[in-house]
């Protein structure tokens, strides 16, 4: 099979859909791989690294002309126009973008959105969301620590003691749990909130305090169970109580990291404008 790996053209995108290690395995299985020149440069992987494992370096047209195209993000209209009818596209294609799906269908392309893979043991190797969320949670803490004008851990000196930074993490999925672990390793005092009571043990096992918002109705308890490891939209009554709890914790926090996400929907607004205006000077929101 001819496999193509084009350069990602979305603004700010630095990832590449295949590393030299992956390409080496594909070529070892008898496939032919064409990589667009410069596709791996922003990931610190030069063309020579791909050539060393047997890949062919070509232009965009050569990469998109393959039978199987590997992409990080969904292709735009110009990129779709370069693909062959009947070819296969694999990547994070945003399955909730109906317009993009319609364009791919009209082009006769078979598309597999990896973020739609079920979160099961059998499909674990396809779980790109968890791997990327893990990185996002780690990086979010580093970004917050970089912009925070003081220190993360408690520092004791002859001149006095500086208290540890207080970090509030909203959402305790893969990204949130990694953010908790990273913030704790940097010495911060961490609190975390999530709609799912089941994650309380996971939060506390990492050394953070769980911001508990009690569930008062059957509807709230049902929504809090989630589906496939993901949260569901919560009733307005619970959201109001949660907003008050977040407001109180945010005013005491130095860094707030928001990771909450609902698949296929706009991320919930967990920090209100009034809360932000009252937060401590120098505090950071990621």
Predicted feature residues:
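A structured beta-alpha segment of the ubiquitous adenosine-cofactor-binding alpha/beta core
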Residues: 54-64, 74-75, 221-256, 260-277
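Glycine/serine-rich phosphate-binding loop and adjoining beta1-alpha1 elements at the start
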Residues: 2, 8, 77-166
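Generic hydrophobic/aromatic pocket-lining and core-packing "Φ" positions
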Residues: 23, 47, 80, 101, ...
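Glycine-rich phosphate/diphosphate-binding loop of Rossmann-like nucleotide-binding domains
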Residues: 6-45, 153-249
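Residue-level detector of alpha-helix initiation sites
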Residues: 74, 135, 173-174
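An N-terminal-biased, well-structured beta-alpha scaffold segment characteristic
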Residues: 2-103, 107
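Glycine-centered, small-residue-biased loops immediately flanking beta-strands
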Residues: 283
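Short, ordered loop/turn segments at secondary-structure junctions
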Residues: 8-10, 37-40, 74, 94-95, ...
């Amino acid at each position: 099979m001819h496999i193509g790996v084009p350069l990602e053209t979305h603004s700010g995108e630095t990832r590449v859909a295949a590393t030299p290690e992956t390409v080496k395995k594909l070529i070892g299985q008898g496939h032919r791989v064409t990589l667009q020149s410069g596709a791996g440069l922003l990931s610190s992987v030069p063309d020579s690294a791909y050539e060393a494992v047997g890949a062919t370096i070509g232009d965009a047209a050569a990469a998109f002309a393959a039978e199987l195209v590997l992409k990080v993000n969904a292709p735009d209209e110009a990129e779709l126009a370069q693909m062959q009818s009947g070819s296969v596209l694999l990547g994070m294609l945003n399955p909730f973008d109906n317009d993009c799906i319609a364009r791919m269908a009209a082009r006769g392309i078979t598309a597999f959105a990896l973020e739609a893979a079920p979160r099961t043991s059998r499909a674990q190797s396809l779980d790109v969301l968890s791997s990327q969320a893990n990185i996002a949670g780690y990086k979010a803490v580093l970004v917050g620590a970089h912009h925070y004008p003081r220190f993360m851990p408690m520092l004791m000196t002859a001149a006095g003691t500086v208290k540890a930074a207080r970090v509030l993490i909203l959402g305790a999925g893969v990204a949130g749990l990694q953010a908790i672990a990273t913030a704790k390793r940097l010495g911060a005092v961490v609190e975390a909130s999530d709609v799912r009571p089941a994650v309380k043990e996971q939060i506390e096992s990492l050394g953070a305090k769980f911001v508990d918002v009690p569930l008062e109705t059957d509807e709230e308890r049902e929504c809090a169970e989630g589906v496939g490891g993901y949260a569901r939209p919560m009733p307005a009554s619970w959201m109001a109580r949660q907003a008050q709890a977040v407001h109180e914790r945010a005013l005491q926090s130095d860094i707030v990291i928001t990771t909450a996400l609902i698949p296929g929907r706009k991320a919930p607004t967990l920090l209100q404008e009034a809360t932000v205006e009252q937060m401590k000077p120098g505090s950071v929101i990621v």
